[in-house]
Amino acid sequence: MDKNELVQKAKLAEQAERYDDMAACMKSVTEQGAELSNEERNLLSVAYKNVVGARRSSWRVVSSIEQKTEGAEKKQQMAREYREKIETELRDICNDVLSLLEKFLIPNRSQPESKVFYLKMKGDYYRYLAEVAAGDDKKGIVDQSQQAYQEAFEISKKEMQPTHPIRLGLALNFSVFYYEILNSPEKACSLAKTAFDEAIAELDTLSEESYKDSTLIMQLLRDNLTLWTSDTQGDEAEAGEGGEN
């Protein structure tokens, strides 16, 4: 199937909410080796975000059930085995994406915006791996995530307006990384607040086409700040849950 047909099929799969099919199409497009257009890049991102998101959600539910079944050995064993099955799927998906990033996407990009987008993606998928990692593996995975986010963050500060949705989405996810993975609420709040304040100060630079995406992510940053600075702690919002790239 040629590239245009694969892209069309990916769009069809998205409308049908068949994200595994959508991801398979965009994986094939990526493996053809050409640099992806913005539209193709977003299709790839949306597909895998949904594919991995379903497993992350399942993993949280089953982990919670596993913890609650202490004392009921058979039930706990069943929950543990099921969690491990979901973990295997989740790891395979993350490794798939990380392989595409390393082999094709990061080397083939020509614009700083694309580099930030793909390095953010690399940080995200190592973060998802870190959520389910344990023991000796975890530190290396966490380091990989932090390095990718940090590199993306440095480039975004040099090359992008504070209101750019990719720069804002990166700040959002990097702050979630500090809060959830590194257990550093002060650093998470500082990063999120700085990103929000810098964007507010330059609202007049917002382009019409990115207005909706940027303001949505700013709202998510503010929601997280409210959550993190209050006594109640729930699930943090994350870029992509609403309408980020």
UniProtKB/Swiss-Prot annotation:
CDD domains membership: 14-3-3_beta_zeta (cd10022)
Family recorded in the similarity comment: Belongs to the 14-3-3 family.
Functional summary from the UniProt entry: Adapter protein implicated in the regulation of a large spectrum of both general and specialized signaling pathways. Binds to a large number of partners, usually by recognition of a phosphoserine or phosphothreonine motif. Binding generally results in the modulation of the activity of the binding partner. Promotes cytosolic retention and inactivation of TFEB transcription factor by binding to phosphorylated TFEB. Induces ARHGEF7 activity on RAC1 as well as lamellipodia and membrane ruffle formation. In neurons, regulates spine maturation through the modulation of ARHGEF7 activity.
UniProt-annotated site: Interaction with phosphoserine on interacting protein, residues: 56, 127
Protein's recorded name: 14-3-3 protein zeta/delta
Classification via SMART domains: 14_3_3
Residues recorded with modification N6-acetyllysine: 3, 68
Modified-residue entries (N-acetylmethionine), positions: 1
Subunit structure: Interacts with CDK16 and BSPRY. Interacts with WEE1 (C-terminal). Interacts with SAMSN1. Interacts with MLF1 (phosphorylated form); the interaction retains it in the cytoplasm. Interacts with Thr-phosphorylated ITGB2. Interacts with BCL2L11. Homodimer. Heterodimerizes with YWHAE. Homo- and heterodimerization is inhibited by phosphorylation on Ser-58. Interacts with FOXO4, NOXA1, SSH1 and ARHGEF2. Interacts with Pseudomonas aeruginosa exoS (unphosphorylated form). Interacts with BAX; the interaction occurs in the cytoplasm.
Taxonomic superkingdom: Eukaryota
SUPFAM superfamilies xrefs: 14-3-3 protein (SSF48445)
Record PTM Phosphoserine, positions in chain: 58, 184, 207, 210
Keyword flag Acetylation: yes
Gene3D superfamilies: 14-3-3 domain
UniProt-listed PROSITE patterns: 1433_1, 1433_2
One of the GO biological process terms: protein phosphorylation
Compartments, as annotated in UniProt: Cytoplasm; Melanosome
Gene, per the UniProt record: YWHAZ
PANTHER family with a match to the protein in the record: 14-3-3 PROTEIN
Organism of origin: Ovis aries (Sheep)
Entry keywords, A to Z: Acetylation, Cytoplasm, Phosphoprotein
Entry annotated with the keyword Acetylation: yes
Annotated positions of the Phosphothreonine modification: 232
Record's GO cellular component terms: melanosome
